[in-house]
């Protein structure tokens, strides 16, 4: 279906801002526990095949995360395009309280990628536990026992330049 604007142009012919070409969404409710500073694959993945090599792909992620520590710890999150890391944050969810408590969050980040291809791309999230200290540390995706409806969502949107 083509949407036409008041001036007679359509989504595909109007000049100006980027246009949305396609959207692909995936989600995961699989619980992941990260125990080391080595990044581990998750099933939080989405596949998209760009229609033009000049188009960009906007990745949007909503994550259900938790950190527990008797001292301090953090959850590291990394975004891959295929096997290449294109974004990471070793302190995405940081627990710095010197007390044995759980800190749970639903959080969001975006990354605008320029993949320069028309082949299928797999975007994937990895996780790791960072800021290792004395005592007990735990870092999780999808570990929110009081609300089982939480999960991680990843969205890939192809956009014209």
Where do the language-model regions lie?
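Glycine-rich, low-complexity segments
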Residues: 1-31
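Terminal beta-strand-rich extracellular "head" domains
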Residues: 26-27, 33, 38, 49-161
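Extended, low-complexity regulatory regions
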Residues: 44-48
């Amino acid at each position: 279906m083509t949407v036409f604007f008041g001036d007679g142009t359509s989504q595909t012919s109007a000049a100006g801002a980027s246009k949305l070409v396609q959207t692909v969404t995936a989600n995961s409710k699989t619980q992941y526990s990260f125990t080391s500073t080595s990044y581990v694959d998750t099933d939080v993945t989405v596949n998209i095949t760009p229609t033009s090599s000049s188009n960009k792909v906007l990745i949007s992620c909503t994550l259900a995360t938790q950190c527990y520590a008797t001292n301090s710890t953090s959850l590291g999150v990394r975004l891959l395009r295929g096997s290449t890391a294109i974004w990471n944050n070793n302190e995405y969810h940081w627990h710095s309280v010197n007390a044995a408590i759980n800190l749970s969050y639903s959080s969001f980040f975006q990354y605008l990628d320029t993949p320069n291809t028309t082949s299928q791309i797999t975007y994937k999230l990895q996780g790791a536990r960072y800021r290792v200290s004395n005592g007990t540390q735990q870092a999780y995706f999808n570990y929110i026992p009081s609300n089982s409806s939480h999960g991680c969502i990843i969205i890939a949107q192809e956009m014209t330049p």
